[in-house]
């Protein structure tokens, strides 16, 4: 053996992987073997590990016991880092947690206090008593109410009570195993309730609109029929009908378009026209009027302007040239209703007079001739109707009128 190797000391820094002990500085010689180093560590290391339980690692290599340090350590390094790993053959038992000791102490104190006050105080049946349940596998404590355990049917009938207790549990208090934890309403149920609420709200709104329209029409009919019923009462004047007067003075908008749900149709073209659309419309009109003004006389320009104004007013509904028969007879409905009762009386009197005179046949022929003469139009009326129909057919019609 080289005698010079025995005189060369070397410094080793022993590190523990679990950081339980601080780094230990050990002085040895290069001619030592790994087994001799382990024996030295079993004497000087704080934990006094056994030689057979020690594992030395240097530069990621496990060192066997027969190798010498001079064959392993790098000579250019001043300090050599060696990791010591000890295999624990008899691991210490895990100490009891402070919470276990505290719970046992609290249970013992509560038992002693209950035994001290048992002579003076009687516990009520509804008093909540906490029971400690220890799980064999997980080791978790769960506290439940004794009332919920004694009456499980009531707990099943009212699961939200258990759910409220679960939300307000103390630390360390688990969920009762008999009742699953679930939310009150799932997201799908919330979406369904929102959809039903919107549907019901829309139906109520449509019913309110329809009821308002029906009530307004019914009030107008009652106002129109009230003077007829009171006209035959002697010594009483019929009360004024302000609603009827307002309806006679103001034009009735009978051309309101209704959608399928019962509400008025909103004209999207008028609502969606922005300032750019209006500028485009006015620019087209300005170009047309400038062409007419510069390439014709002033009188023709005035005529074209007047014609365009008439066409615009016709399309807007100010000058409806062709009205339906029902619309022409609409202003006369009130007068016809007012005179209906008197006309019926006159017809009855006329029928009685004709039956008395025996002139039913002759009066029937005269009435037929008068009706045919009244229905046969004259030559001027036919010509005027033809001319007006021809020229008004050249003018584009306005929006269609939907009768409700």
From Swiss-Prot:
PROSITE patterns referenced in this protein's UniProt entry, alphabetically: UBIQUITIN_2 (PS50053)
Q: Name one GO cellular component term.
A: membrane
Q: Where is this region: Disordered?
A: 86-153
Q: Where is the composition biased (Polar residues)?
A: 127-153
Task: Name the CDD domains on file.
Answer: Ubl_HERP2
Q: Where in the cell is it found?
A: Membrane
Keywords (A to Z) from UniProt: Membrane, Transmembrane, Transmembrane helix, Unfolded protein response
Q: State if Ribonucleoprotein is listed as a keyword.
A: no
Where is this chain compositionally biased, Low complexity type? Answer: 88-97, 109-126
Q: List the Pfam families hit by this protein, alphabetically.
A: ubiquitin
Record's function text: Could be involved in the unfolded protein response (UPR) pathway.
This protein is called Homocysteine-responsive endoplasmic reticulum-resident ubiquitin-like domain member 2 protein
Q: Which organism is it from?
A: Mus musculus
